[in-house]
Amino acid sequence: MSIEMEEFEGNEAEFLHGSKEYGADQIQILEGLEAVRKRPGMYIGSTSVRGLHHLVYEIVDNSVDEALAGFCNTITVKIHQDNSITVRDNGRGIPVDIQKKAGKSALEVVFTVLHAGGKFGGAGYKVSGGLHGVGASVVNALSEWLDVKVYKEGKIYTMSFAKGKVTKPIECIGTCSEEEQGTEVHFLPDASIFEESVYEFETLKIRLRETAFLTKNLKIRLVDEREGMEQEKEFHYEGGIQEFVSFLNKGKEALYSDVIYCEGEKEKILVEVAMQHNDSYTENIYTFVNNINTPEGGTHLTGFKNALTKTFNDYARQNKLLKDSEANLSGEDIREGLTCIISVKIEDPQFEGQTKQKLGTSEAQVAVQGIVSEQLTYFLEQNPAVAKVICEKSILAQRARAAARKARDLTRRKSALDGVGLPGKLADCSSKDPERCEIFIVEGDSALGPAKEGRNPETQAVLPLRGKVLNVQKARLDRIYANEEIKGMITAFGTGIHEDFDLSKLRYHKIIILTDADVDGAHISTLMLTFIYNFMPELIRKGHVYLAQPPLFTIQKNKKHYYAYSDEEYQRILKEIGSDGADVSRFKGLGEMNTEELQETTLDPETRTLLRVNMSDEDKAELDITFTTLMGDQVEPRREFIEQNARYVTNLDI
């Protein structure tokens, strides 16, 4: 289905703010609502906990559209005791007059007809976010009940729905001051549709904080009213995406104090870019279209990369920071340690693929490239000290990349010469079918024997870690390729890393990290996850990385064996079987288990417990901050993180 948007003509303010006229005639109806309850995944992605939270985002995005249009500056989100949600804004209020085509109130149309809203047709909004613009009607269809209250032109209107159907028609219930305007939506997700019904404050906090960063001067309050969970957060950032970059760089050493900021309008597209280099060796670039994350990038990202690479190479040549005989800096060299936010506002964005996560609008590349090239060139000329610091870091990155390439090529040549090229310490499995195969990354020599003996040699491989795993958060690419433990993992997995990564070459569909259930084991697990997250993130995204869960206790009574994986489970088992005559042992390490115990608790797919490591693109910013906190140089943020999160840890061995 194609949706024709009216062509923009006018000044920049009108482009962003749209029309003050926001009545029933600005609401356009495009199709019905029948399919939503039958196939909810098509509209909100899934019926998991992610889909549950997506309902909140849909309503919030409608309020953000009002903020982008210049009519709203405060949004409040409340989680109530029964896990229902209220979203209140101080925008213009959804129109309540009769929509001519439907012959019913615009409020009813917005909540009962799919693809009905001011974002279609152009007069209500010039730019808007939201998933396919489905918004309010989909939330209504997937809710047990939904009540909406509109404050508009001195009057208060209400309307109620259940599972998408009207239960109480629109009614004016009183008056309010002319200043008290806006929309309040209160809904309870339908428990028969969603796998989970409990909202996570932390999940909502991350998304709402991001929204506030992207919408300068918008205030968002998140309130949890549930008993025992009462808390409140407020997000309000006058610095917008510049503050966002500073927030993401927290815990890292910035190479220069000011966040570089480029802003402008070109090709009817509004562009904002904020960036700052830090002393790390990884790049973190986040792209947004109309405040919606585009994790797969697209034309706006391409435009930025082109501008960045050309501008810095031109500057380095003109200022003799690069010799005539030296090669140009690559984009990767310049982006090493870069944190960047790219935000574009487009009236009619075009996306590629099914997921709508990659921008395809060709004009966005031209707009971003032009604005960044011009304004970044000016910034470098005005700030030669900053320009020199970035160029020097980029030149070091170029040299390290060349050294890493030599090390990588040497590894490949060795692999070709010795035939298979797998690490000598790897006890491989005989099956060549990756879907059946799994590899255990085992800490230390003591557990190696039982792991080798207890595994299924047909489908289970074992790779021991004997030396120290490198903390890649603090290491350049050449050091990573020089580390024997990491080299062993790269070779065993088969995928390569970084720009060479190829998921189709993965040799094992389960990569299982097996360490002691103590602080040292947790540290080694974190080092390995840091490496995989930074250089093979697709392994985590596709669900190939797992943490084994060896037991903490073994309990024997009346010739029966029980295993406890936490102190709570240990207490529960003792309570059930009675402590009299019970023989209890605590495993201090994997090496204390015999082959049968390790096989039963950790190796055998029928009896073991595994934790799959999950991540999504929505989590990326929060994950970057967490890994920086845990694996970075600064001690104080790490101590604060541990103190704040210790209560969530079940096996803390201090």
Question: Which residue stretches match the model-derived regions?
Answer:
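GHKL-family ATPase ATP-binding module
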Residues: 2-23, 33, 55-57, 65-67, ...
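Mature N-terminal segment immediately following signal peptide/propeptide cleavage
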Residues: 25-38
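Conserved short strand/loop->alpha-helix "switch" segment adjacent to the catalytic nucleotide/phosphoryl-transfer site
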Residues: 38-57
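A short glycine-centered beta->alpha linker in the GHKL/HATPase_c
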Residues: 93-98
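Short adenine-binding "F-helix/F-box" segment of the Bergerat
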Residues: 99-100, 107
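C-terminal interaction appendages of subunits in large macromolecular complexes
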Residues: 399-418, 433-438, 449, 453-455, ...
